[in-house]
A protein has these predicted regions:
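Short, acidic/polar
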Residues: 16-31, 96-105, 203
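Generic enzyme active-site microenvironment
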Residues: 4, 36, 41, 115-117, ...
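Beta/alpha (TIM)-barrel catalytic core signal, keyed to glycine-rich beta->alpha loops juxtaposed to Asp/Glu
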Residues: 45-250
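Intrinsic structural disorder
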Residues: 1-2, 30-36, 219, 246-250
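CE4/NodB-like, metal-dependent polysaccharide N-deacetylase domain
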Residues: 20-41, 80-84
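Structural motif corresponding to the early beta-alpha repeats
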Residues: 1-19, 42-46
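Short acidic capping loops at alpha-helix termini that bridge into adjacent secondary structure
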Residues: 1, 35-39, 88-89, 200
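N-terminal binding-site loop/beta-alpha segment at the start of enzyme catalytic domains
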Residues: 1-2, 22, 83, 119
Length: 250
């Protein structure tokens, strides 16, 4: 078994970054009764220093990490935690501004793992609030090109690629993109029915079929959903023609 945890850092003064990451990690280790984790992820979205968020820019310092902070403070802090034996590896969330992520991936000290949004819709939905032009496929391809270990996220795109949404839209309107994606995904559900497979199972198998993906991160709420994901994994990768049909569906 491999264990991971993450920290939503934001943008802090450089001298505060290690302490914040170490505090978060220490709390996680205490909660899990462990001495170290295999992977520690930066959970804040990356952006260039002067980039304005497409949405919620007033929360920029809290919800995103600037590249200068990432290069000058976050990477050294992660490396220090490795030297201290508290983590084996570190990585990034793979969300944020396209250009910032490409620079992070190609930096002289690249992340040792990256979470990549991966689904047939090529959509991060509501969490793509930093860059309205966020392109998950572009980040995935850049990660593949650089042979970064990839953890797939948003396989069912917050429910949009399941049989039905499991919640009502939030009153703030924050998650309207997820519900818009559900409507847009109607052809996907039609294909799933044609192939006699649940939409959620098909979406997870799609993610598992993508080259160089090491793991698919699940967002299940109960054992029924977990068992469905396990069965999807047991079915294995999609046939080439199925994968191609889904890849070109939208």
């Amino acid at each position: 078994l491999n264990f991971t945890t993450k920290c939503s850092l934001g943008t802090l003064a450089d001298e505060q970054v290690y302490d914040r990451l170490n505090l978060s990690l220490t709390k996680s280790l205490e909660n899990m009764n462990m001495e170290k984790v295999n992977l520690f992820l930066l959970h804040s979205q990356l952006r260039e220093d002067d980039f304005k968020l497409s949405n919620f820019n007033e929360m920029r310092e809290k919800n995103s990490t600037s590249l200068s902070s990432y290069f000058n403070a976050v990477i050294p802090a992660f490396e220090k935690l490795k030297q201290e034996g508290k983590i084996d590896h570190w990585g990034i969330g793979g969300l944020g501004q396209n250009e910032a992520l490409v620079k992070a991936i190609n930096h002289e000290i690249p992340p040792e793992a990256i979470q990549c949004v991966l689904n047939p819709l090529n959509s991060a939905g509501a969490i793509a609030y930093v860059d309205e032009n966020f392109d998950p496929t572009a980040i995935l391809k850049e990660s593949q090109k650089n042979n970064l270990p990839i953890l797939s996220i948003r396989a069912v795109q917050a429910g949009a690629l399941t049989g039905s949404m499991d919640r009502e839209p939030h009153s703030s309107g924050f998650d309207h993109k997820d519900f818009d994606d559900y409507v847009r995904a109607a052809p996907f559900r039609e294909l799933a029915a044609k192939w006699d497979e649940s939409p959620a199972s098909l979406a997870h198998r799609y993610a598992l079929s993508v080259s160089k993906v090491g793991s698919v991160i699940l967002g299940v709420k109960n054992r029924i959903e977990l068992k469905e994901c396990i069965k999807a994994e047991e079915k294995g990768e999609l046939a080439t023609e199925q994968f191609s049909a889904l890849k070109n569906l939208f």
